[in-house]
Amino acid sequence: GIDPNYRSLPVVKEEQGVKIYGTYEPPTKLGIWGTIVGVDFDLCIADGSCINA
């Protein structure tokens, strides 16, 4: 699942007010998006395990 301490990773980009943490190298590495709810687009397979609220 998502790293519960993802907010300690560096903010590498901000897209429409949403912070992106970790590695952001599209199209292969998309990082973890969000602050209140985090979505790891590198782990997400639509089963909900990529969301940390």
Swiss-Prot record:
Instruction: Identify the keywords attached in UniProt to this record, alphabetized.
Output: 3Fe-4S, 4Fe-4S, Electron transport, Iron, Iron-sulfur, Metal-binding, Methylation, Repeat, Transport
Q: How is the cofactor bound?
A: Binds 1 [3Fe-4S] cluster.
- Region annotated N-terminal extension, chain positions: 1-35
The record places domain 4Fe-4S ferredoxin-type at 34-53
The cofactors required by this protein are: [3Fe-4S] cluster; [4Fe-4S] cluster
Q: Which terms in the Gene Ontology molecular function aspect does this entry carry?
A: 3 iron, 4 sulfur cluster binding; 4 iron, 4 sulfur cluster binding; metal ion binding
Residues found modified as N6-methyllysine: 29
Could you tell me which Gene3D superfamilies the record lists for this protein? 3.30.70.20
**What does the entry list as the binding residues for [3Fe-4S] cluster?**
44, 50
Described purpose of this protein according to its UniProt entry: Ferredoxins are iron-sulfur proteins that transfer electrons in a wide variety of metabolic reactions.
Identify this protein by name: Ferredoxin B
The organism named in the record is: Sulfuracidifex metallicus
